[in-house]
Amino acid sequence: MTKYVFVTGGVVSSIGKGIVAASLGRLLKSRGYSVTILKLDPYINVDPGTMSPFQHGEVFVTNDGAETDLDLGHYERFTDTDVSKLNNVTTGSIYQSVINKERRGDYMGGTVQVIPHITNEIKERIRRVAHDTNPDVVIVEVGGTVGDIESLPFLEAIRQFRKDVGRENVLYIHVTYILHIPTAGEMKTKPTQHSVKELRSIGIQPDILVCRSDRPLSVGIKDKISEFCDVPVRAVITCQDAQTIYAVPLNLEREGLAHQAITLLGLEQRQPDLRDWEILVDRICNPSRAVTIAIVGKYVRLSDAYISVVEALRHAAVALDAEVKVEWVSAEAVEERGAGYFLNNVDGAVVPGGFGSRGIDGKVSAIEFSRGHRLPFLGLCLGMQCSVIEWARHTAGLAANSTEFDPQTPNPVISLLPEQADVVDLGGTMRLGLWPCRLQEGTLAHRLYGETLVYERHRHRYEFNNAYRKAIIEAGFQISGASPDERLVEIIELADHPYFIATQFHPEFKSRPNKPHPLFFGLVRAALERKETERLPASPAPVPLPSAV
């Protein structure tokens, strides 16, 4: 029988429910249990694909082409398991499904209501994940904060779920925050008490409390929380702020989170194997050197908009016994002050993906600087498209652009994918998900990957215009990767540059702490070589971690 763990949050938003859920997944997998993690998002959007990065952060793309919440990236990175469209459910998708059923007449003329129709649909989505993946444990993160009106249908659904599948098969974990008042020198539990009271008023009594704090909880504080929240002291878990998110599983293991969860679910207690994860965290926290890499983007005011890029850089750095210091550079600021002002003192640069014309000239300027000053460079999606525009303007002397930014440009070096010509809706209609890419032997990309056929995740509507293919090759660029039918250019690179490579896909989505992505490894390695002269490994040396169950 599959077991279910529901993770809710209280007191404040962005409290770290996703990291707690992902950490528990890691701890269970270290004991040999198979796990999948599901995110329930209370917003009415069908998916986050059309949401502003400033409001939502990164849109994480899965192998099957789902545009999902960034927490799914944490799930994949912590558990080393691919997730799918089934692992992200929104209020919008629930209502869309229920309304479609009503229009088809599935409810036989009945009045459609939140209870039972919406709650039943939510429960069905949870069961579907369990049915399709057949894990030992399904961990469900409930988005939002207890007390939010948007979350009520989800909370009612998970309340009912325990009755449906049996109390012994369901566990409720509530993540809360313990405030410290510096002037009083005290830690305050009252917000946590009120949060649990709110949860209990819905009919959910948490089994475990995970208490975020900037310092350890004293025995007295744990006793107080236990007394007022009706949770055993052993189930009051400290989750202290950590130097790196990858240390959280180890901290929660020391606090006994997994032991308590396994006991309450009636599973067999097994000895965890976290030795390799401990090595990983030690290398993250104690690097022998550092390198600075600029991320030149449109959404740098919210670093979560590029969270997978940052994590991919960190994964590569760990494999090289280094730390990456990220320099955030606004593409619009580059337009005002010039690329040199921001890039003169960095060791490498990344131009990530995005949409729209704002800041494009700044990205192009940053790419021109990187090319001309031999600065290690990696372009991602829009970053590749801007690399082509930069070449066309400054090497070929063309008044070039993308038709996304200028539909009337005389030299459309980037143009709309043919299959996108008649697309009207924006949501879920791009080229999405995992697609094959064939690499040219002898190229930098081929050396880094070490294989000829690779699969990468995509999210784009525009592509390199093949009418300019011959010209870009004559100008010195190599097309080192393309779709197997040779129609879509996937990777371009410069052979006479220390490291200049750009991709139409998003390699950051496939990077893992123990398996850095080859292209990010290559960038960080080139940046280190620029900074120092010592010999470095020639290929990514994965940090060993327990294999996926």
Swiss-Prot record:
Miscellaneous remark of the record: CTPSs have evolved a hybrid strategy for distinguishing between UTP and CTP. The overlapping regions of the product feedback inhibitory and substrate sites recognize a common feature in both compounds, the triphosphate moiety. To differentiate isosteric substrate and product pyrimidine rings, an additional pocket far from the expected kinase/ligase catalytic site, specifically recognizes the cytosine and ribose portions of the product inhibitor.
Enzyme Commission code(s) on record: 6.3.4.2
Pathway listed: Pyrimidine metabolism; CTP biosynthesis via de novo pathway; CTP from UDP: step 2/2
Chain positions recorded as CTP binding sites: S13, D148, I149, E150, K188, T189, K190, P191, T192, Q193, K224
Domain of life, per lineage: Bacteria
GO molecular function: ATP binding; CTP synthase activity; glutaminase activity; identical protein binding; metal ion binding
EC class of the enzyme, as a word: ligase
Pfam families: CTP_synth_N, GATase
Binding site for ATP: S14, I15, G16, K17, G18, I19, D71
Domain Glutamine amidotransferase type-1: residue ranges: 292-533
Residues that hold Mg(2+) according to the record: D71, E141
Annotated catalysed reactions: UTP + L-glutamine + ATP + H2O = CTP + L-glutamate + ADP + phosphate + 2 H(+); L-glutamine + H2O = L-glutamate + NH4(+); UTP + NH4(+) + ATP = CTP + ADP + phosphate + 2 H(+)
Stated name of the protein: CTP synthase
Activity regulation details: Allosterically activated by GTP, when glutamine is the substrate; GTP has no effect on the reaction when ammonia is the substrate. The allosteric effector GTP functions by stabilizing the protein conformation that binds the tetrahedral intermediate(s) formed during glutamine hydrolysis. Inhibited by the product CTP, via allosteric rather than competitive inhibition.
Region feature (Amidoligase domain): 1-267
Gene: pyrG
Record's keyword terms, sorted: ATP-binding, Glutamine amidotransferase, Ligase, Magnesium, Metal-binding, Nucleotide-binding, Pyrimidine biosynthesis
One Gene Ontology cellular component: cytosol
Binding site for UTP: S13, K188, T189, K190, P191, T192, Q193, K224
Function: Catalyzes the ATP-dependent amination of UTP to CTP with either L-glutamine or ammonia as the source of nitrogen. Regulates intracellular CTP levels through interactions with the four ribonucleotide triphosphates.
Subunit structure: Homotetramer.
Keyword flag Magnesium: yes
Any one GO biological process: CTP biosynthetic process
Active site: C381 (nucleophile), H506, E508
Sequence positions that bind L-glutamine: G354, L382, G383, M384, Q385, E404, R461
Family label: Belongs to the CTP synthase family.
UniProt-listed InterPro entries: Class_I_gatase-like, CTP_synthase, CTP_synthase_N, GATASE, GATase1_CTP_Synthase, P-loop_NTPase
